[in-house]
Regions:
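Fold-independent oxyanion-binding glycine-rich loops
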Residues: 1-2, 54
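Active-site loop ensemble at the mouth of alpha/beta enzyme cores that anchors a bound cofactor
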Residues: 2-26, 32-35, 39-40
């Protein structure tokens, strides 16, 4: 079935949020899988790195001691600015480096239009 119908969008933050919420619900314990533990689960032993925009509205409120960044990121998502995988820059300053996003979206629109022309 896959990502096209599961709704996860291949976003690791969405998956992390779902993991925490499912455990909390399943065990009726809102203290299970705090954001710090969830973040460690998705980054443990990783040699890749990502930088998020801490000024993104989803990163607020920051809390009295400015300590809510991980909780905001895990439970609200965030705007990915930079991403490096195996030493290669995938995103820099919020711009994908490995593909032309506009062209990819245009190709997707054209493929969907072509598909529906054949069945409508």
């Amino acid at each position: 079935d896959g990502a096209a119908s599961s709704g996860n969008g291949l976003n690791i933050l969405n998956e992390a949020r779902t993991a925490a919420l499912v455990q909390r619900h399943d065990h009726w314990d809102p203290t299970l899988l705090p954001a710090k533990d969830v973040f460690n689960m998705i980054t443990k032993d990783s040699k890749d790195w990502v930088a998020w925009d801490l000024e993104d509205f989803r990163m607020f409120p920051r809390g009295r001691s400015n300590n809510r960044h991980l909780a905001n990121l895990v439970f609200n998502g965030g705007n990915c600015l930079d991403m490096w995988v195996d030493g290669q820059a995938i995103r820099l300053n919020g711009v994908t480096q490995t593909i032309d996003e506009r062209l990819a979206l245009e190709n997707l629109d054209n493929a969907v239009d072509s598909y529906y022309e054949g069945i409508e």
